[in-house]
Amino acid sequence: MSALEWFAHKPLGSGIFWIQERFYESGNRANIWLVRGSQRDLVIDAGLGLRSLPDYLRAAGLLAPPDGAGPRPLLAVATHVHFDHSGGLQHFEEVAVHSAEAAALLRGDNYEAVTWLSDREVTRPPRPGWRARHFCVPPVRPSRLLQEGDVISLGDRQLTVMHMPGHSRGSICLHDREHKILFSGDVVYDGSMIDWLPYSNVSDYVVSCQRLMELVDRGLVEKVLPGHFNMFGAERLYRLASNYISKAGICHKVSTCAMRSIASIALHLTNSRGTSS
């Protein structure tokens, strides 16, 4: 299967494209965002990596500027290293991730990447004989380590890194202040927020949600482009964040701890910590 078959995209205007993996039919299917700038293009999250995303972008003509001068530099940023977001980083020359998860990416740690994929989720295998049990996130050396407050410049567009741990220890959002757009990764999406994985932390998540609410209160976000499911606006962002905070009491922390223990055992059985096998 070619990259052109595996991926599909939808233009959203203002140089932003929404890309998905067509034959990965799962709640874990991550949204991939392409943001085009005057000097650099940016991919936010990279999917599973079963087919080359850069090949798709080139074949679909998404990297060629209007003047036909040739492709601009391309940077791939992972909002966190979970497998559905980081598997495709292997196909990029320039890769950025938050420093808290850089070591996991470098060693191909499929425990921290929470790699969990089944044959039934991949409705059309990328090649004959492919099996989900052979899938892993390979080691990738990041070319840039991100920190809170870093700015990724695309020339005519600036994206500010917000370190928002909770879902994972290195989770980030990218904030386009000028256009009031938040690329939220898995920090928040229109669904149940997951805080029971290895390296999740409820207390950190509460603080991150408070920051999300502050963005809305200050009028700094109008549109959220999340890591999963559909886009939504500021009012929904505020409600999702406030709802999480309201439920994050002692009972929730206890139940989350139990779920994390179960998830950790399951992930240890399917993935060797610190390896990509």
Curated annotation (Swiss-Prot):
Membrane topology: Lipid-anchor
Binding site for Zn(2+) 2: D84, H85, D186, H228
Molecular function terms from GO: beta-lactamase activity; long-chain fatty acyl-CoA hydrolase activity; metal ion binding
Lipid metabolism is among the record's keywords: yes
Sequence positions that bind Zn(2+) 1: H80, H82, H167, D186
Keywords: Cell membrane, Endoplasmic reticulum, Fatty acid metabolism, Hydrolase, Lipid metabolism, Lipoprotein, Membrane, Metal-binding, Palmitate, Zinc
Enzyme's top EC category: hydrolase
Domain of life: Eukaryota
Keyword rRNA-binding tagged: no
Gene Ontology annotations of biological process type: fatty acid metabolic process
Cofactor(s) required, per the database record: Zn(2+)
SUPFAM superfamilies attached to this UniProt entry: Metallo-hydrolase/oxidoreductase
Cofactor note: Binds 2 Zn(2+) ions per subunit.
Gene3D superfamilies in the cross-refs: Ribonuclease Z/Hydroxyacylglutathione hydrolase-like
EC number: 3.1.2.2, 3.5.2.6
Entry's transmembrane regions: none
Catalytic activity: hexadecanoyl-CoA + H2O = hexadecanoate + CoA + H(+); dodecanoyl-CoA + H2O = dodecanoate + CoA + H(+); tetradecanoyl-CoA + H2O = tetradecanoate + CoA + H(+); octadecanoyl-CoA + H2O = octadecanoate + CoA + H(+)
Similarity comment: family membership: Belongs to the metallo-beta-lactamase superfamily. Glyoxalase II family.
Protein purpose: Acyl-CoA thioesterases are a group of enzymes that catalyze the hydrolysis of acyl-CoAs to the free fatty acid and coenzyme A (CoASH), providing the potential to regulate intracellular levels of acyl-CoAs, free fatty acids and CoASH. Has an acyl-CoA thioesterase activity towards the long chain fatty acyl-CoA thioester palmitoyl-CoA (hexadecanoyl-CoA; C16:0-CoA). Displays a substrate preference for fatty acyl-CoAs with chain-lengths C12-C18.
Official protein name in the record: Acyl-coenzyme A thioesterase MBLAC2
Gene giving rise to this polypeptide: MBLAC2
